[in-house]
A protein has these predicted regions:
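Ferredoxin-type iron-sulfur electron-transfer modules in oxidoreductases and energy-metabolism complexes
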Residues: 173-196, 213-246
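Iron-sulfur-associated redox domains of electron-transfer enzymes in respiratory
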Residues: 1-191, 195, 209
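Iron-sulfur cluster-binding cysteine motifs and their immediate structural context
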Residues: 148-159, 197-199, 203-224, 246
Length: 246
């Protein structure tokens, strides 16, 4: 599968359909995989990797990448307008156009779709390719309970069939059904108990596929929200309720 992805990325680069590729880069060890941007076929051959350690969801990286692309376009348009104001005969300079290729696992495509709905990603700047889930190591209950096994919103698919029927995972809703069956007070106590385990490491915020704020409210020193351990149950609830509604 890795060879197929590299070959397709090279093809799109050589045809000029994309100018950059967002994928995964190998590190010193087999499991040392990090997201990376590739611009040439040589870089792809040297560092691109796709295996069971490619856990990172690449969709969030598109927020910054497409923003930079759109900023370059806006700057070029503004420069052309200002040039015309100085000299009505001035020739417009070309508006830069760039499309980035991104590989998305089935579950990642749902994050991609949500960010599109929130206008956090410019769709015209992205060529999305759906790829199969590699059954990532240590997926455990997370991958086993995943509801996003059917890729969506991609321009093409490699190794996955977007039309294939996926059997619903009914087991993942059993815990939800138990919580919904509780009384209001019972649900409150359940979540209070869950919140009490929080050490405010911010891992849930950082990994959340929909969290894309430039400045998080919980990084505001003026509001005393940067402290790690909540002093009261109210602070615990505040953090998680805001996280749930972001």
């Amino acid at each position: 599968m890795q060879d197929k992805l590299i070959a397709r990325a090279k093809e799109l680069l050589s045809e000029g359909k994309v100018q950059k590729v967002v994928g995964w880069k190998k590190g010193l060890f087999d499991d040392d995989i990090t997201p990376a941007v590739f611009a040439t076929a040589e870089e792809l051959d040297k560092d691109f990797v796709f295996n069971k350690y490619c856990k990172a969801n690449l969709s969030k990286y598109l927020v910054g990448i497409t923003r930079n692309i759109e900023t370059a376009k806006s700057t070029a348009r503004m420069n052309n307008t200002m040039a015309k104001q100085r000299d009505p005969n001035a020739q417009d300079k070309p508006i830069p156009s760039e499309v980035v290729l991104v590989f998305l696992k089935p579950s990642d495509t749902y994050s991609f779709t949500q960010l599109l709905k929130e206008s956090r990603i410019t769709r015209d700047d992205v060529y999305a390719v759906g790829v199969p889930c590699q059954d990532t190591v240590d997926g455990g209950d997370v991958c086993g309970n995943c509801a996003g096994k059917k890729p969506v919103s991609c321009d093409e698919y490699i190794g996955v069939d977007p039309e294939a029927e996926v059997a619903p995972n009914t087991a993942r809703m059993e815990e939800v059904a138990k919580i919904e069956a509780m009384s209001v007070n019972g649900r409150y106590e359940f979540w209070r108990n869950e919140f009490s385990r929080c050490i405010r490491c911010n891992a849930c915020r950082n990994v959340c596929p929909a969290c894309t704020c430039e400045k998080c409210v919980f990084d505001n020193n003026a509001l005393y929200t940067t402290q790690k351990v909540a002093e009261t149950s109210f602070e615990e609830s505040l953090f998680h309720i805001i996280r749930a509604w972001q």
